[in-house]
């Protein structure tokens, strides 16, 4: 099994593309959902965030106030690094758990939906393939204005706050161009799924695990039949 990192930009159509992959039966892990999950009350990251930033980051029900926390780390590299040092290990741990579940179920590849895949670069080394859902800037701007009922100025500000899609496209191994008709984009997704599904890149890990399991079974057989004393 291998990992596929998928990202996009605001109003690029990433969520719609993810839905198509899921309809095709693909395994998808949303890293944003994991990030929200691991900071819930009762989890280690929640306790460490409160210890590091104080009870002012808590809502009345004990949940983390994401807006307050975001304001605290805004333009504060040291605080942002501290928060990342708390959350990233827990995110990776949960991500690996979910990935292993899909491995046991026989999936050949798993898609990781990672909004900041190229910005943080922390998970890039684990990705066998990277995919960007792209659209040209004019299309992105028009979609964002229509979807969020924004002025042109506000929409442009939101787009400028992100790494440009054209830069992400240059860094990605695969680009799904969602600038035109949705039927064309959907066809690209289907073709990419077929390419990934028929790839043999999943074999090394699966063979390695099977070899390891065979070794353990063989060792247990030797222990029970030849090396351990009979009762």
UniProtKB/Swiss-Prot annotation:
User: In its keyword annotation, does this UniProt entry include Calcium?
Assistant: no
Write out the entry's keywords from A to Z.
ATP-binding, Nucleotide-binding
Database matches in Gene3D superfamilies: P-loop containing nucleotide triphosphate hydrolases
Ranges for domain DPCK come to: 3-207
- Per the record's keyword annotation, is Chloroplast included, yes or no? no
Q: Check the UniProt entry and state the signal peptide residues, or none.
A: none
Q: Which GO terms describe its biological process?
A: coenzyme A biosynthetic process
PROSITE patterns to which the protein is assigned, alphabetical: DPCK
One short Pfam family name for this protein? CoaE
Family annotation (InterPro entries): Depp_CoAkinase, P-loop_NTPase
Named from the GO MF annotations, one term is:
ATP binding
Which positions bind ATP? 8-15
* Superkingdom, natural source: Eukaryota
Q: Which family does it belong to?
A: Belongs to the CoaE family.
Which NCBIfam families does its entry note?
dephospho-CoA kinase (TIGR00152)
Cited HAMAP family: Dephospho_CoA_kinase
This protein is called Dephospho-CoA kinase domain-containing protein
This chain's source organism reads Bos taurus (Bovine)
């Amino acid at each position: 099994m291998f990992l596929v990192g998928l990202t996009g930009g605001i109003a690029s159509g990433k969520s719609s593309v993810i839905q198509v992959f899921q309809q095709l039966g693909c395994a998808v892990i949303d890293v944003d959902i994991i990030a929200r999950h691991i900071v819930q009350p009762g989890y280690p990251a929640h306790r460490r965030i409160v210890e590091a930033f104080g009870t002012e980051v808590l809502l009345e029900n004990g949940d983390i106030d994401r807006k307050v926390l975001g304001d605290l780390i805004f333009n504060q590299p040291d605080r942002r690094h501290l928060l990342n040092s708390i959350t990233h290990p827990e995110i990776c741990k949960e991500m690996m758990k979910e990935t292993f579940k899909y491995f046991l179920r026989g999936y050949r590849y798993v898609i990781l939906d990672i909004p900041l895949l190229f910005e943080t670069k922390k998970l890039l080394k684990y990705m066998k393939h990277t995919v960007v859902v792209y659209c040209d800037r004019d299309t992105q701007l028009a979609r964002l204005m229509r979807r969020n009922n924004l002025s042109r100025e506000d929409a442009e500000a939101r787009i400028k706050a992100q790494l440009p899609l054209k830069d992400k496209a240059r860094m990605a191994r695969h680009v799904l161009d969602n600038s035109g008709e949705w039927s064309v984009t959907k066809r690209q997704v289907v073709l990419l799924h077929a390419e990934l599904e028929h790839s043999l890149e999943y074999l090394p890990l699966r063979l390695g695990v099977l070899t390891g399991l065979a070794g353990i079974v063989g060792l247990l057989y030797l222990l029970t039949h030849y090396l351990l004393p009979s009762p």
